[in-house]
């Protein structure tokens, strides 16, 4: 297959975008409704405006294509985010990072830890609920924790959602007919804590769309003055590649499209006909030039690819249906809708042996990149992401600055006026999306481990084909991406690529970028903590110290007045600041209820240091570099403990303490590798 170069966005795109950007009537500039649409295993190259339209424009009959008119329309009306990344190249860790707002070096769910509890900390839903949002999750979950249920440790209703409807278990999302279980057996759909009966012939993509629409309609009828947040997690196009029962109902929106009926045996209006049967007409009889010879007859697309194309087109219809509902209810203007995928394209179909094996080569779902699901090259992580919010995002916006999926918690909190927990690794993307304010750079970092190799696809560079995966890392700073595969230790070099000029990552610049190499190696240690359940070959590496010219003894103590249920990321100016000799609440300025000490910690010797604190029942948080070392910001009924490997020398530190008692006090301890525990002495602090 051929590699298609990037093409300029057409004048037609900008003309249509201009027309759609004309202001509409009827909505105030208030807290927006927020809908986060997360699809499963959709490649960057699966969406028309990101790649498939380019294939069509070349009209190469050996290169089949898929159209996504509804998603194209959404992109033209809003923002295309061309350089947006998934937090991990597989679903469970990717979703966990999204919902918790942290990178994989801080997440409780890493690697292939399917069905592991998401962790006890602030979630996207809890943050938005604090800003009076009604919160609902629809679709695939897979982050509930051990047990048979329904009382799982991190069931959606226990982590900030008011309502839930969908598949709780990860594996259930691999079958799209929960009753008939056509290929992988029947599955359980839950509404809150109860299993749902009567879902005969319900194709899950349609079912989740119907339930999402039903919630929005009922919410607007009853609580239209209260904003809502919806986490809509489709289980498609992930295998098994099952077909819907029938064509998509006409119309869309309030009175058309998929409709929730609520009757057992006829729960939705497409729960009739034959399960796993309908192929879109444009694919049913599609042919292609299989041998790249115009003199020979074309052949039909294999049924496997008719299925994949139908599933993708169905997603397009489902999103269009939902967007039409927002228009019909006159809430589109002030509803922020984000569409993205959890990782890159898959090569799985889970179909019986008589079907042709599925490969993303047929449609080039990986677009201009190398790598697929489970890779940290661009094809495994770059996601086709669209943001739509007419009142604030201009039509035709193209955002090409790098960002990552754990930025959405901070973004949604910013839009809602909610405080962002200080633990959050993400940043608000509103400046990029709206063109207002200065965009803070995203911290784009991924770590992941997976056995196996990169597929030997002809489209991929020979140097990438068959490459061992193993322990992997990716970090992006500006236009540069650093990648490590099959890591044996911290001294392994990153491959370095300028992905703005070399999206396929064919020219490794590491041989003449020694300073950048050192910077990437240091950066990758300064934003993560080790996890015993996901060990890494660099867990014992020492976090490099900094060279600081003429440091002075002591710290800077800043105080703030905050109105927040937790310690937030701070963007406002301090109301007071003072140079202090030690870490003591009594020495900080008296004004304000939040103290933040900033400076450097002088580590006397290389080694592992374990930190702990006596902070009473007050909220408390400590970062060294960008490492979350001590987190007492979620639960205040226990003392946090955190360990980190530190090189001798100075390390930047920020320590936060919320004064919540009549006699506020804070003591910080460290224990060295010999087991000696002491309060961090005043002489260890510099500014």
Predicted regions mapped to residue ranges:
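Loop/turn elements at helix/coil->beta-strand transitions in domains of secreted/extracellular proteins
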Residues: 30-35, 77-82, 130-136, 159-162, ...
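Bacterial Sec-dependent N-terminal signal peptides
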Residues: 1-29
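Polar, surface-exposed loop/tail segments
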Residues: 69, 98, 140, 144, ...
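Extracellular/secretory pathway-exposed regions associated with glycan biology
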Residues: 533-610, 614-687
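Short, solvent-exposed turn/loop segments enriched in Gly/Ser/Thr/Pro and often Arg
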Residues: 41, 50-51, 78-102, 113-116, ...
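Active-site-proximal cap/lid insertion segments
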Residues: 41-65, 168-403, 409, 413-427, ...
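C-terminal, low-complexity/hydrophilic appendages and adjacent surface loops
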Residues: 183, 373-379, 448-510
């Amino acid at each position: 297959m051929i590699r298609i170069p990037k093409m300029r966005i057409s004048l037609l795109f900008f003309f249509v975008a201009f027309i759609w950007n004309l202001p509409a009537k009827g909505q105030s500039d208030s807290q927006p409704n927020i809908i986060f649409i997360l699809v499963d295993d959709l490649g960057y190259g699966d969406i028309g405006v990101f790649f498939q339209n380019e294939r069509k424009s070349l009209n190469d009959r050996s290169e089949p294509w898929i159209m996504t008119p509804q998603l194209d329309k959404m992109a033209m009306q809003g923002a295309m985010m061309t350089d947006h990344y998934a937090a991990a190249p597989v679903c469970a860790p990717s979703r966990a990072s999204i919902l918790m707002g942290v990178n994989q070096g801080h997440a409780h769910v890493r690697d292939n830890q399917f069905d592991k509890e998401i962790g006890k900390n602030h979630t996207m839903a809890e943050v938005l609920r604090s800003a009076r949002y009604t919160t609902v999750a629809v679709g695939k979950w897979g982050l509930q924790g051990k047990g048979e249920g329904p009382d799982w440790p991190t069931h959606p209703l226990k982590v900030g959602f008011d309502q839930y409807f969908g598949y709780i278990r990860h594996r259930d999302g691999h079958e799209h007919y929960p009753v008939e279980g056509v290929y992988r057996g029947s599955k359980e759909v839950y509404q809150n804590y109860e299993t749902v009966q009567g879902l005969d012939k319900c194709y899950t993509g349609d079912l989740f769309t119907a339930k999402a629409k039903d919630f929005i309609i009922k919410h607007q009828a009853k609580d239209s003055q209260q904003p809502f947040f919806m986490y809509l997690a489709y289980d498609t196009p992930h295998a098994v590649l099952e077909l819907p029962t029938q064509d998509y109902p006409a119309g869309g929106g309030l009175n058309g499209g998929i409709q929730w009926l609520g009757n057992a045996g006829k729960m939705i209006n497409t729960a009739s006909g034959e399960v796993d049967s309908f192929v879109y007409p444009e694919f049913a009889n599609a042919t292609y030039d299989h041998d790249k010879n115009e003199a020979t007859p074309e052949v039909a697309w294999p049924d496997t690819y008719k299925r994949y194309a139908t599933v993708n087109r169905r997603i397009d219809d489902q999103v269009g249906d939902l967007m039409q509902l927002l228009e019909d209810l006159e809430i589109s203007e002030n509803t922020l809708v984000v569409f993205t995928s959890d990782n890159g394209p898959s090569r799985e179909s889970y179909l019986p042996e008589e079907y042709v094996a599925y490969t993303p080569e047929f449609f080039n779902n990986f677009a201009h990149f190398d790598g697929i699901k489970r890779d940290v090259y661009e094809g495994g992580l770059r996601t086709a992401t669209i943001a739509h919010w007419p009142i604030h995002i201009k039509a035709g916006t193209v955002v090409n600055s790098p960002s990552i999926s754990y930025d959405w918690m901070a973004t949604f909190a910013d839009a809602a006026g909610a405080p962002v927990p200080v633990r959050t690794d993400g940043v608000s993307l509103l400046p990029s999306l709206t063109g207002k304010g200065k965009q803070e750079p995203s911290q784009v970092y991924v770590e992941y481990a997976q056995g196996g190799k990169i597929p030997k696809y002809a489209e991929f560079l020979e140097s990438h084909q068959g490459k061992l995966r193993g322990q992997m890392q990716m970090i992006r700073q500006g236009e540069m991406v650093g990648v490590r595969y099959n890591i044996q230790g911290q001294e392994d070099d990153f491959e370095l690529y300028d992905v703005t000029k070399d999206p396929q990552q064919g020219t490794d610049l590491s041989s003449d970028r020694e300073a950048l190499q050192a910077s990437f190696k240091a950066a990758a240690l300064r934003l993560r903590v080790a996890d015993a359940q996901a060990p890494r070959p660099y867990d014992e590496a020492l976090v490099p110290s900094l060279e600081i010219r003429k440091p002075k003894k002591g710290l800077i103590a800043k105080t703030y007045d905050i109105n927040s249920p937790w310690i937030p990321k701070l963007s406002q100016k301090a109301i007071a600041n003072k140079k202090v000799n030690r870490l003591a609440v009594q020495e900080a300025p008296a004004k304000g209820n939040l103290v933040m000490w900033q400076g450097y910690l002088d580590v006397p010797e290389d080694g592992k240091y374990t930190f702990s604190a006596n902070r009473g029942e007050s909220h408390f948080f400590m970062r060294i570099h960008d490492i979350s070392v001590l987190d007492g910001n979620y639960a205040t009924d226990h003392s946090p403990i955190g360990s980190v490997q530190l090189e001798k020398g100075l390390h930047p530190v920020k320590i936060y303490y919320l004064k919540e008692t009549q006699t506020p006090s804070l003591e910080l301890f460290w224990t060295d590798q010999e087991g000696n525990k002491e309060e961090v002495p005043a002489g260890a602090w510099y500014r």
